[in-house]
Amino acid sequence: MPYEIKKVFASLPQVERGVAKIIAGDPKGNNFLYTNGKSVIIRNIDNPAIADIYTEHAHQVVVARYAPSGFYIASGDTSGKLRIWDTTQKEHLLKYEYQPFAGKIKDIAWTEDSKRIAVVGEGREKFGSVFLWDTGSSVGEIIGNIKVINSVDIKQTRPYRLVTGSDDNCCAFFEGPPFKFKFTMSDHSRFVNCVRFSPDGSRLASAGADGQIFLYDGKTGEKVCSLGGSKAHDGGIYAVSWSPDGTQLLSASGDKTAKIWDVAANSAVTTFNLGSDVLDQQLGCLWQKDYLLSVSLSGYINYLDKNNPAKPFRIIKGHNKSIQCMTVDKSDGRSTIYTGSHDGHINYWDAETGENNTFTGKGHTNQVSSMDLDGSSQLITCSMDDTLRYTNLISKDYSSSESVKMDVQPKCVAVGSGGYVVTVCIGQIVLLKDKKKVFAIDSLDYEPEAVAIHKGSGTVSVGGADGKVHLYSIQGNSLKDEGKTLPAKGAVTDLAYSPDGAFLAVTDANKVVTVFSVADGYSEHNSYYGHHAKALSVAWSPDNEHFASSGMDMMVYVWTLSDPDTRIKMPDAHRLHHVSSLAWLDENTLATVSHDACVKQWTVTFK
């Protein structure tokens, strides 16, 4: 293969305030599962940088769970589709697909023999279904709740019991198979968010928005106690997870804490305070082997430390909204990837280990549209919040003084030498020097979309929606229109100079990449055809001979300058999502980012 995936830095869980987030464990204890958009993300619990992504759902996926055998995963989406797929092969072949009801699937449970499956959620005519995994034949009826069912679990020992938790403040208890409704437990005074049997089936825990956790006998459904007396948490409880030996219970709450409960003593033995910000609310949790995980409203996954409850020993960070732009810094001998997302977050990643973090302080408040490095430890970014920011890469801290307010919304930014920066805004081109606006061109007869600066000559190329590249030159503190335009094949979406400055590559909305020769007075060198939809981004390899382009067709092409027919096609680079930006780490390693909020690295080999 001329290309292969080298690393996947996965997205965070997609979270919503006031809604429980399920992170599910692996029966073998190696991985954990969660969802974001149309993707199911499988991550290694020991080393979260190892990740696998499943993207075969046509709609947003809500929940995914391993079968107890470990060989299959069932995942459910907002349309009510349930897909059961193979975990043993990279292709994740589909085994079965069902539509138990029309509406959002909110939770899934398997029997311990991996033969029966229960699915609950927001159906139109019913809120749940339980059936054989291989034929879809019904093995009972889920009744007893009169509102949306949020949670379901099946006792993992015989005789089987099934329980559901609903927005009608009740849990429904079933015996089977075939599963028959026995009674409702109406102890909660608010929505029931989570119901879970202990591993040996002796106990059942239910957690609700009233801040209470009730324990029941797993076999009979009789109430045993309320954990912590009248209140287990000061806020709603979104998730509970049993310890492997069933003696303790982990709970996650909107009061920004997680707690470990000693079930026999009916008391909290450890309380983890995870912050004071609203984004520190805890929406999900998982106890697997010796690991205790919780999910914050920020999307961060916390590895809780029993010995130091005040501070998680690891926090998985990243993006959970679409990534719009990226750049790579190779200055200190190792590669750092910078990414900016739709919600204004900027992350920096160690390209080797996947360790990442965000800048401290208050940064952009809206989509980060474009970014570039100035070669002296500064990242320059522009955003839909109408600002241009200079962020110091050594302190990694946003400073309010380093923000430049624009008259209109900026779209793209490019850095030249000598402290010059050019940004294109809606109907405007702005020149900045040493963090100050020094010149602007307002009366344009075209809409500027993208910009690149030739590092040697200071020529500024501005790509327009009129299908042309307009050339300007920096002269002192002003921009001079050179009166020359280059014809692209459609509205320009991105442009980039080769590292040696000899060529300019231009992508356009008509799926073409056009390369112009700088030395020949910007004459057209060649055109490169292959994309099936609008091309979005272009980046040159350090070897000056190859360049990569990405598009809305989910594809990445690696082109050869001297021969348009010699190309490497990477279909489904980010399946079901636009590939929004790319950058080269070295001559054989390409990094791509996408609306799936993931960062991928590819090893590209040339013949």
UniProtKB/Swiss-Prot annotation:
Where in or outside the cell it occurs: the entry states: Cell membrane; Cytoplasm, Cytoskeleton; Nucleus
InterPro entries tied to this protein = G-protein_beta_WD-40_rep, N2O_reductase_N, WD40/YVTN_repeat-like_dom_sf, WD40_repeat_CS, WD40_repeat_dom_sf, WD40_rpt
User: Where does the record place its WD repeats?
Assistant: 4-45, 48-87, 93-135, 138-176, 180-218, 224-263, 270-306, 311-351, 358-408, 432-474, 480-518, 523-561, 566-604
Coiled-coil ranges per UniProt:
none
Question: GO molecular function of the protein, one example?
Answer: actin binding
Superkingdom of this protein's organism: Eukaryota
Listed under GO biological process in this entry are: actin filament depolymerization; actin filament fragmentation; locomotion; sarcomere organization
The UniProt keywords, alphabetically, are: Actin-binding, Cell membrane, Cytoplasm, Cytoskeleton, Membrane, Nucleus, Repeat, WD repeat
Q: Does the keyword Nucleotide-binding apply?
A: no
Its GO CC terms are: actin filament; cortical actin cytoskeleton; cytoplasm; nucleus; plasma membrane
Q: Which Gene3D superfamilies match?
A: YVTN repeat-like/Quinoprotein amine dehydrogenase
Give one Pfam family, short name only.
Answer: WD40
- Protein family per UniProt: Belongs to the WD repeat AIP1 family.
What does the UniProt record say this protein does? Answer: Induces disassembly of actin filaments in conjunction with ADF/cofilin family proteins. Doesn't sever actin filaments alone, but caps the barbed ends of filaments severed by cofilin, which blocks annealing and depolymerization and allows more extensive severing by cofilin.
Record-given protein name: WD repeat-containing protein 1-B
| Organism listed in the record | Xenopus laevis
